[in-house]
Curated annotation (Swiss-Prot):
Protein's cellular compartments: Cytoplasm
The protein's Enzyme Commission number: 5.2.1.8
Protein name, entry field: Trigger factor
Domain of life: Bacteria
Family in the record: Belongs to the FKBP-type PPIase family. Tig subfamily.
Any one Gene Ontology molecular-function term assigned to this protein's record: ribosome binding
Gene giving rise to this polypeptide: tig
Cited SUPFAM superfamilies: FKBP-like (SSF54534), Triger factor/SurA peptide-binding domain-like (SSF109998), Trigger factor ribosome-binding domain (SSF102735)
InterPro entries given in the database record: PPIase_dom_sf (IPR046357), PPIase_FKBP_dom (IPR001179), Trig_fac (IPR005215), Trigger_fac_C (IPR008880), Trigger_fac_C_sf (IPR037041), Trigger_fac_ribosome-bd_bac (IPR008881), Trigger_fac_ribosome-bd_sf (IPR036611), Trigger_fact/SurA_dom_sf (IPR027304)
Reactions the enzyme catalyzes: [protein]-peptidylproline (omega=180) = [protein]-peptidylproline (omega=0)
One GO CC annotation: cytoplasm
Coiled-coil positions: none
Intrachain disulfide bonds: none
Length: 443
């Protein structure tokens, strides 16, 4: 067998394999003889069909079968000998499968990039630290009180903090726009859930006294046809309600399943939950910072085949988020625009390549104790921790998910161990509620 390897553009390789005709003909003849012993053809007894008849009738199909199988066996051997690791399925084209000639074919594919990990030992990586303070707990208590206000109807003009039920319709240039109207819409004035100016415009309004307000949609509003535009909203207030904060007493604590200890037990429970969520978020943010820093100093050529595969995974994930998991295995996924997923796919592929190389270089293996500890940590947040443990341990797939998370933590820990680090203190709210240009409702 002769093998030649040609480097094409980037990671693409072209392998040409030539198998001697003697080997091909020997295999073809062997299969035809075996076929002659069992084939049934009209006019001949089973096993008595002349070889030349079998050959004339089945030679082409047997030759194609031999060619397919030889591609599988010889290509694997060629890749092994030349230390080539395909990043995707090779595109194979047979060049010659004629009798009496060597069997030749080409295989074109991308190879996995070969590189050495550059460690983070130069520029410092900034990580964050945070903790739950008494003030954070008090703020959370106040949020819970706000969420549990007792509302009663009033007749006075709307003031900040009131809840209103309104009918409204929005107009652009005196024409109604899609999604700009609602009936019986509940809104707490001052909640900031609507576009700037909308809630302020309702202050002072009275029941069943229609009025108009003019507001402008933010320049970065999610709907491009509305962004930056001035709109008029015709509003009718149907109901005004004033809220009363519940007292901080045992009755309030019992609403959150606190049976003993009253408000102090509630605060303790809230602090523990906040600390657990804060730790999870800080770990996630620091892990992302470490991984991003590792990617920034390790520039790797990414195989298009891996990016394409990851894009398909992301499309599938989006389909599940939009339409649920109940669908047939062969159901066609909508052709979402590729650009929606390309950057995320490239990041995942880049990080995956670095991750695999880092694990190999530092011989990192998922530690069973750490896997069990992570399961215990997950279980501690549930009312029936033993059931959650049993759920993870009942499936190799479930355990593999935890092992992957443990590996991520172990890799992040190792990167941090070798890197130059500096820390930035952040308060609870800045970590848990980072400011985003989120779209607010204006309909």
């Amino acid at each position: 067998m002769q093998v030649s390897v040609e480097t094409l553009e980037g990671l693409e390789r072209k392998v040409t394999v030539s198998v001697p005709t003697e080997k091909v003909e020997e295999e073809v003849s062997s299969r035809l003889r075996n076929l002659a012993r069992k084939v049934k053809i009209d006019g001949f007894r089973p096993g008595k069909v002349p070889f030349n008849v079998v050959k004339s009738r089945f030679s082409d199909s047997v030759r194609e079968e031999v060619a397919r199988e030889m591609v599988q066996s010889t290509l694997y051997e060629a890749l092994q000998k030349n230390e080539l690791v395909p990043a995707g399925y090779p595109h194979v084209e047979p060049l010659e499968i004629e009798p009496g000639k060597d069997f030749k074919y080409t295989a074109v594919f991308e190879v996995m990039p070969v590189f050495e990990i550059v460690e983070l030992n130069q520029a410092p990586v900034e990580l964050i630290r945070s903790e739950v303070t008494d003030k954070d707990v008090d703020n959370m208590i106040e949020k819970l009180r706000e969420q549990n206000k007792e509302w009663h109807e009033v007749t006075h003009a709307v003031k900040k903090g009131d809840k209103v039920v309104i009918d409204f319709q929005g107009f652009l240039d005196d024409k109604p726009f899609q999604g700009g109207s609602a009936e019986g819409y509940e809104l707490v004035i001052g909640s900031g859930s609507m576009i700037p100016g909308f809630e302020d415009g309702i202050v002072g309004g009275k029941i069943d006294k229609p009025f108009d307000i003019k507001v402008s949609f933010p320049e970065d509003y999610g709907h491009k046809d509305l962004a930056g535009k001035e709109a008029t909203f015709k509003i009718t207030i149907k109901k005004i309600m004033e809220g009363k904060l519940p007292a901080l007493d045992e009755a309030f604590a019992e609403k959150f399943n606190i049976k003993e200890g009253g408000i102090e037990s509630l605060k303790k429970d809230i602090r523990e939950n906040m600390a657990r969520e804060l730790e999870r978020r800080v770990n996630m943010m620091n892990r992302e910072k470490l991984f991003d820093s590792l990617m920034s100093v390790n520039h790797v050529e990414l195989p298009i085949a891996l990016i394409d595969k990851e894009i398909e995974h992301l499309k599938h994930d989006m389909y599940h988020r939009l339409f649920g998991h109940e669908h047939k295995d062969d159901e066609k996924i909508p052709d979402f625009p590729r650009e929606l997923f390309e950057e995320q796919a490239k990041r995942r592929v880049h990080l995956g390549l670095l991750f695999a190389e880092y694990v190999k270089k530092h011989e990192i293996v998922a530690d069973n104790d750490k896997v069990n500890a992570m399961i215990d940590k997950f279980a501690s947040a549930y009312e029936s921790p033993d059931e959650l443990r049993a759920w993870y341990q009942s499936s190799k797939e479930h355990m593999a998910e935890v092992e992957a998370l443990v590996m991520e933590d172990m890799v992040a820990d190792k990167i941090a161990e070798d890197a130059k680090l500096k820390y930035k203190n952040m308060d609870y709210d800045s970590v848990m509620n980072p400011k985003k240009g989120t779209e607010k409702k204006g309909e």
